[in-house]
């Protein structure tokens, strides 16, 4: 038998999808209070989700107790798997968690532009459209490679196995799911995804392109997961646990307007905000 092959295990290059907990302050109690406020109504929402602690937003002379943040995340049932830091933040390597290298979707320049836009938006009048207020300041969806650990935003994502096999039909880069998805099932499409049945609470549909759901959406829908800001979500009945495009999230903690809740809608990104508009089908 070749020494490079084994019936017992394999070592392969791969990718996993995870979240970034983006630290903006060294005030642990402020983070604890904000986590409690955001998730006290849905304490199981991110249960067992893996997360990497991202400290790159901290100033060069600021330090934070990574073990305490890991315990904080563990208290809300998230699973810290590593730390993302800039090269000058050598102190982060002292953590018991592995130091990971992230490849952001838009790069550091875009992050700076985002911060400037956020400051400008804070001084401007509030928009009146059905916009989302995503918790992206706390969580940003990323993907990672095993060589660096977990987080990296430009890598492919390997989905978790579904609870039961789901029959799929694919054409070019479009995947079609013709059965309802029950809690615990997850579908991943490298292009567009079309779902013909119910997406139940606890189910998850993920696509690098657009998502079309011709039934109620009650679970999670994540479109444009590889950073495609032009991706959209279409559904005939919007009742989601979570919607996301290119890492910008909206959860049930931010109630949907009555004119879109339970209605046919389309969802897209505009200036880093999720826009939700009723679909006029007649």
From Swiss-Prot:
Biased composition (Low complexity): 118-127
Keywords assigned: Cell cycle, Cell division, Septation
Extent of the signal sequence: none
InterPro entries the record matches: CAP/MinC_C, MinC, MinC_C_sf, MinC_N, Septum_form_inhib_MinC_C
Pfam families attached to this UniProt entry: MinC_C (PF03775), MinC_N (PF05209)
Keyword Cell division among record annotations: yes
Region (Disordered): 108-127
One GO process term, biological-process aspect: cell morphogenesis
Cell division listed as a keyword: yes
HAMAP family on file: MinC
Family: Belongs to the MinC family.
Function: Cell division inhibitor that blocks the formation of polar Z ring septums. Rapidly oscillates between the poles of the cell to destabilize FtsZ filaments that have formed before they mature into polar Z rings. Prevents FtsZ polymerization.
Known partners and oligomeric status: Interacts with MinD and FtsZ.
Protein name: Probable septum site-determining protein MinC
Phylogenetic placement of the source organism: Bacteria, Pseudomonadati, Pseudomonadota, Betaproteobacteria, Burkholderiales
Gene name in the database record: minC
